[in-house]
Amino acid sequence: MAISKEEVLEYIGSLSVLELSELVKMFEEKFGVSATPTVVAGAAVAGGAAAESEEKTEFNVILADSGAEKIKVIKVVREITGLGLKEAKDATEKTPHVLKEGVNKEEAETIKKKLEEVGAKVEVK
């Protein structure tokens, strides 16, 4: 008996955010793909030199190392991301880990400062 596309969509719709996140990770591993959005190169070609001189406006905040004060880092990670305790703990143990994607420069620097204050090593890219 084959499962219809509608049944698959209904099942996915019933998943919690955590379960859906785990499912996405499984898809990425099984099929060797990434769920991160890709940038269209055609727009940059049309802009020419003007596009190259523009300052980057979106940044990713990456936890490179959680340091010695893991509990404090977990608390800050939970505050920043809204993750649950287990997910925040996993994020601090599996470094490097992207905590926030596509944030503005000011927010990225604020997050970096908060994490560095509790002993974490953070990269902003």
Swiss-Prot record:
GO terms for cellular component: cytosolic large ribosomal subunit. NCBIfam families: L12 (TIGR00855). The keyword Ligase does not apply. It comes from Helicobacter pylori (strain Shi470). The gene is rplL. GO terms for biological process: translation. Forms part of the ribosomal stalk which helps the ribosome interact with GTP-bound translation factors. Is thus essential for accurate translation. Homodimer. Part of the ribosomal stalk of the 50S ribosomal subunit. Forms a multimeric L10(L12)X complex, where L10 forms an elongated spine to which 2 to 4 L12 dimers bind in a sequential fashion. Binds GTP-bound translation factors. Keywords: Ribonucleoprotein, Ribosomal protein. Belongs to the bacterial ribosomal protein bL12 family. This is Large ribosomal subunit protein bL12. It comes from the Bacteria.
